[in-house]
Amino acid sequence: MNRRDILKSAALMPLIPSIHALSQDPKHLWQGYDFGSNFAAKDRLSQGPFDIDQDDGWQTILFTTPSEKPLRNPGLGLLGYTWEEGGPSIAVREGRQTLEDHVEKMASLPFVDVLYIRCDWRNVQKQPGRLDLDPIWDLTLAAAKRHGKRVAFRVQSSNTAFQPKQLALPEFLRAKVPMVSIGHIGMYGDAGDTTKGDYIEPRYDHPEYQGALAELNRMLADRFDGNPLIEFVDVMHIGFWGEGHFSGYPSPFPDAETAKRTLSQMVRMQLATWKKTPLAMNTQPDISFTGNREAIDIAVRGGAWVRSDSIIVEEPIQIEELANRPPWLAAILEDGTLRQYDAPKLKVDAAGVNELENYMLHVLDLKANYWSLWTESENLASYNERYPRGFARLRARMGYRVRPSWVWQRKRFGTSELVAAVSNNGVAGVPGVLWLTAKSPDGKINLRGSLEPGHPYGDALRLGSFLLPKGYVGTINLQAEIEIRPDVLKPVAWACEQPLNADGSLSLDVKPMNDPNWRKGI
């Protein structure tokens, strides 16, 4: 969102916290900081060291080369929006396109991996105790299933786009929760009209709001938590567009301590509700003094992924946090400044790089997993045709791209040990825990084990080993899965140029003990 433009138009004093409140804020660099992991240490493979005095002979039995082809693995991808805070595509809003056609065209784009919905609370619930999902939901879910894509979403409690005519909250909740005027509508009110009134925010700390928020999350989780189509869910945050700020306007909270306590409670509730699908927490700095720093810490310790809704105009603190997040957490990036992807209107710098490409390639600097493409499918296709380098670079490097770059067979303990060096040619660590399976074609041998969370990190490798049953000779298929949430595993395709089996595994041949290619002391 262009919150800094709103700040310029607001010309309002923010709520200033007390010196005592600021003194309690835990400030630290994220680089080198130990947040802890919420993944239990289960069935860890031996990860070395694998020294020369451990074995009675060895040989390299598999080595692979990295592929730059796009992969549709969980935990990474380009996000195509079927709905954003202003609605669907501009053509749908103007009556020139049907909603069905918009969703189908977005889902049909070959470079889109995930379909994303960002809607208001009123778009998912009309009365207490039940979900009333707007048509965009079924259309998006059906298109994702049809085209082999996934779905992510955010439900907003606050949205400037339709104010003052329409607020984000459903009517039944607006009647129960005190609503606070925080200042005259700026440039992002209804149709850009700045003469129609004030921005209105709910009292997020009110018991009716908190109760309804918990109920909504329970209902959404009952429907979507663990659904294989759902990639991630944005934490329901406070503030404009659910980003955790009020863009320079005063906070609707009575004081900073109430805001901090309320937001921390909201985050803990959502972490407790969503067990199988990753949550994503906005890393918005605490410009509105609402306890964002503490809430982000709670979310990260609870295993939530991180996200930012802009990339170039962010403060230094947010860039440092995103780049140095725990490596087992994914990062989601977007920027709404040039969201229409109108290629002919883009400025090009002296190096011949257009503005949007400059923006999106910073995703790689942040070792991120996702980049958002917004709603304009026809413009996206035209942009990619005119400037193909940006999307191509992201799809070749963004997120994690793992493969067994070496596999050694060693004589050890009277049997064969397989040591796999799993390399990651992506920029990000594995968003969760990587599990490896060594399996014989008949299934009689089925060995599994995991690496440490996040390993192999971006542009790094990690070793792990299996001990095979005595006397086994022949084919072993090596397979990968990602534990994306505790006890939730999803298959991962190896990012190598060598051919894979139909199940995504890679075959290797275990040699007999009398094979002439054993090495020792050489």
Predicted regions: what they are:
Residues 26-114, 135-139, 143, 225, ...:
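Non-catalytic accessory regions flanking glycosidase/transglycosidase catalytic cores in CAZymes
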Residues 109, 117-183:
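Aromatic-lined substrate-binding rim segments of carbohydrate-active enzymes
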Residues 121-131, 197-211, 252-257:
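The substrate-binding groove and active-site-proximal loops of carbohydrate-active enzymes
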Residues 396-522:
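Extracellular/luminal regions of secreted and cell-surface proteins that mediate adhesion/ECM remodeling
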